């Protein structure tokens, strides 16, 4: 399909469009035109209506929205300037109902090479079959016909606002290599919400650079993590101490179960013939000899029962008191009623000798 037009459009940036050849495929992936302009133009995001072509420029340009024509495309233009996609025999109506943006793109150098044309073919063969000029969910690039451009090449891209989901969906079409056409343009219009939609981990060579989605931990989280680690260390330390205590108890219990021979462990043995007593301490052995074998001075005897096995006065007094108390099953000292008044009299006389605590305290206060 070919459309010859003699219209001329004068813009602020010296944009002209003379004797253009407009190949219009019905299911192609791009739109090509021939122009001698040095600045690109950008179509808006609208779908087209089939079977007719109307270009409407509502801005500072001359409208020719009522110009409709049946378009046919020669095979030469289709094979040379179109990027993939079958061509329907049925003509298609492409309409621009909204004003074209007047934002010019910067001149691109070094793009008219066979490698770049091949790269455009790969990038523009996306999964969306574009029936109109306006893309939906991808970034197709529209180039002007190289027959009238000479040694330079210009590109026009849609400038409508895209959401984060559309950007994330369209990034797959630009993942061929680091020579993607998006790398020739400065990225200025992407906000923080749209940057979050881009998966930069899958495309580390993108000109947008690697975007770290994980923020550094906050001081509050660091303090909580440190506190949790300290608590865990204390818990493990307490468990280790309890395990050591249980192990020591088990060892001591196993020793006690085997039984202990007191005589064999005692080092102080009685040397009297026929006596096999042994004691752990030397004073116990000495007392044994004084009590049972008559060693040492100051031997004391009980006048109630006649026992003389006491080498100390306090031991004798304790024994005599037991005679003044009634008998019990677990006591081996016999109760003697005559010992009761004697023991009571000794207790009363002992109390008289001891000064009262209150008087002694008063005397100490007076002395100070």
UniProtKB/Swiss-Prot annotation:
Lineage: superkingdom: Eukaryota
Record carries keyword Metal-binding: yes
Key words, A-Z: Activator, Conidiation, DNA-binding, Metal-binding, Nucleus, Repeat, Sporulation, Transcription, Transcription regulation, Zinc, Zinc-finger
Region ranges (Disordered): 338-368
GO molecular function: DNA-binding transcription factor activity, RNA polymerase II-specific; RNA polymerase II cis-regulatory region sequence-specific DNA binding; zinc ion binding
PROSITE patterns, per the entry: ZINC_FINGER_C2H2_1, ZINC_FINGER_C2H2_2
Zn finger (C2H2-type) location: 268-292, 300-323
A Gene Ontology term for the protein's cellular component: nucleus
Induction line: Expression remains constant during conidiation.
Basic and acidic residues bias locations: 359-368
Listed InterPro entries: Znf_C2H2_sf, Znf_C2H2_type
GO biological process, one term: conidium formation
Consequences of knocking out this gene: Leads to immature conidiophores without phialides.
Keyword Aminoacyl-tRNA synthetase: no
Location in or out of the cell: Nucleus
Entry remark concerning the domains of this protein: Both zinc fingers are required to induce development.
Function (record text): BrlA, abaA and wetA are pivotal regulators of conidiophore development and conidium maturation. They act individually and together to regulate their own expression and that of numerous other sporulation-specific genes. BrlA, abaA and wetA act together to positively regulate the expression of the Pks1 gene cluster that mediates the biosynthesis of an anthraquinone derivative pigment that contributes to conidial pigmentation that provides protection from UV radiation, heat and cold stress.
Protein name per the record: C2H2 type master regulator of conidiophore development BrlA
Provenance organism: Metarhizium robertsii (strain ARSEF 23 / ATCC MYA-3075) (Metarhizium anisopliae (strain ARSEF 23))
């Amino acid at each position: 399909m070919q459309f010859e037009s003699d219209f001329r459009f004068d813009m602020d940036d010296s944009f002209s469009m003379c004797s253009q050849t407009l190949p219009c495929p019905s299911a192609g992936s791009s739109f090509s035109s021939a122009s001698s302009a040095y600045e690109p133009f950008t179509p808006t995001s609208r779908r087209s209506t089939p079977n007719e072509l109307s270009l409407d420029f509502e801005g500072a340009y001359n409208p020719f929205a009522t110009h409709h024509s049946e378009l046919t495309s020669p095979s030469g233009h289709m094979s040379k300037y179109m990027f993939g996609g079958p061509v329907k025999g049925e003509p298609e109506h492409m309409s621009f109902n909204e004003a074209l943006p007047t934002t010019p793109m910067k001149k691109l150098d070094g793009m008219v090479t066979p490698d770049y044309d091949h790269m455009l073919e790969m990038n523009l063969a996306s999964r969306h079959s574009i029936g109109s000029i306006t893309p939906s969910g991808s970034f197709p690039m529209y180039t002007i016909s190289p027959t009238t451009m000479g040694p330079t090449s210009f590109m026009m891209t849609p400038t409508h606002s895209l959401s984060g989901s559309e950007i994330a969906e369209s990034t797959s079409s630009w993942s061929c290599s680091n020579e993607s056409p998006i790398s020739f343009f400065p990225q200025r219009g992407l906000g923080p919400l749209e940057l979050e939609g881009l998966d930069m981990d899958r495309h580390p060579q993108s000109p947008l650079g690697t975007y770290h989605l994980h923020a550094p931990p906050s001081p509050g989280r660091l303090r909580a993590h440190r506190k949790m680690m300290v608590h865990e260390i204390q818990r493990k330390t307490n468990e280790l101490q309890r395990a050591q205590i249980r192990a020591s108890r088990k060892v001591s219990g196993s020793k006690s179960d085997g039984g202990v021979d007191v005589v064999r462990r005692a080092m102080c043995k009685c040397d009297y013939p026929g006596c096999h007593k042994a004691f752990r301490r030397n004073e116990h052995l000495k007392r044994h000899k004084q009590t049972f074998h008559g060693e040492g001075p100051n031997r004391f005897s009980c006048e109630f029962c006649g026992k003389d096995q006491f080498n100390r006065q306090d031991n004798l007094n304790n024994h005599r008191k037991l005679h003044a108390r009634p008998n019990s099953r677990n006591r081996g000292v016999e109760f003697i009623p005559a010992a009761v008044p004697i023991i009571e009299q000794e207790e009363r006389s002992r109390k008289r000798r001891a000064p009262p605590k209150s008087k002694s305290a008063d005397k100490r206060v007076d002395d100070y």
